[in-house]
Amino acid sequence: MSDTLNLLAKKRDRAGKGASRAIRREGLVPAVIYGDKTPAMGITVDHIALFKMLNTGHFMNSVVTIDVDGQKLPTIPKDVQFHPVTDRVLHVDFLRVSANSLVEVAIPVSYVDEEKSPGIKLGGVLNIIHHELKLKVKATAIPEEIVVSVAGLEVGDSIHLNQIKLPEGAELAHDEHESTAATVIAPSGMKSNADDEADAALAAAASAASAEKKEAEKSE
């Protein structure tokens, strides 16, 4: 399970663009907590503390417990808005969750055991299509990553989404469950050799057909 993050916050009564700019000048970030059948709550959080959390690499798929003036609220980050030039955080949306809440999150995928793949040993390249998997999972059971073994894969073999083992209680949120997650492709040199062999085979077949035709013409 991914780590739970803790963030201090204060309620905010001010709203609107002017109020948000004033909040940012104070070194704070305006944010909102919504969901779980409760009214939305406007808050402010410290920009530096939030920036550190963003740099953990798993902020968007972690439970963030927000302490709002002593009231601790478990949430999931749903959207982060950045300044287009400075990359400063402008606003954050947090979804309030409970122990039984089902959430949709993007989980990073780690592909392992490349040294056990015959195709990769022969020079094949692991072409990764899905670096993340979208899962529906309980908020209290969000995995930190999904580990996928490529052991035994030959050149041309693929792993599909529906072949990946998921944590108990989790399910894919992708529309196409049979789409390819990763495949072992032939390197350019191997492709060239295969093409050359195919061309040679075609040339030999054409030559043989021509010889047979000539023999047939002679016999006539």
From Swiss-Prot:
The keyword Ribosomal protein applies. InterPro entries: Rbsml_bL25/Gln-tRNA_synth_N, Ribosomal_bL25/Gln-tRNA_synth, Ribosomal_bL25_b-dom, Ribosomal_bL25_C, Ribosomal_bL25_long, Ribosomal_L25_dom, Ribosomal_uL5_bac-type. It comes from the Bacteria. Coiled coil: none annotated. One of its GO terms (molecular function) is structural constituent of ribosome. GO terms for cellular component: cytosolic large ribosomal subunit. One of its GO terms (biological process) is translation. Keywords: Ribonucleoprotein, Ribosomal protein, RNA-binding, rRNA-binding. SUPFAM superfamilies: Ribosomal protein L25-like. This is one of the proteins that binds to the 5S RNA in the ribosome where it forms part of the central protuberance. PANTHER family: RIBOSOMAL PROTEIN L25/GLN-TRNA SYNTHETASE, ANTI-CODON-BINDING DOMAIN-CONTAINING PROTEIN, RIBOSOMAL PROTEIN L25_GLN-TRNA SYNTHETASE, ANTI-CODON-BINDING DOMAIN-CONTAINING PROTEIN. HAMAP family: Ribosomal_bL25_CTC. Belongs to the bacterial ribosomal protein bL25 family. CTC subfamily. Part of the 50S ribosomal subunit; part of the 5S rRNA/L5/L18/L25 subcomplex. Contacts the 5S rRNA. Binds to the 5S rRNA independently of L5 and L18. This is Large ribosomal subunit protein bL25. It comes from Zymomonas mobilis subsp. mobilis (strain ATCC 31821 / ZM4 / CP4). The gene is rplY.
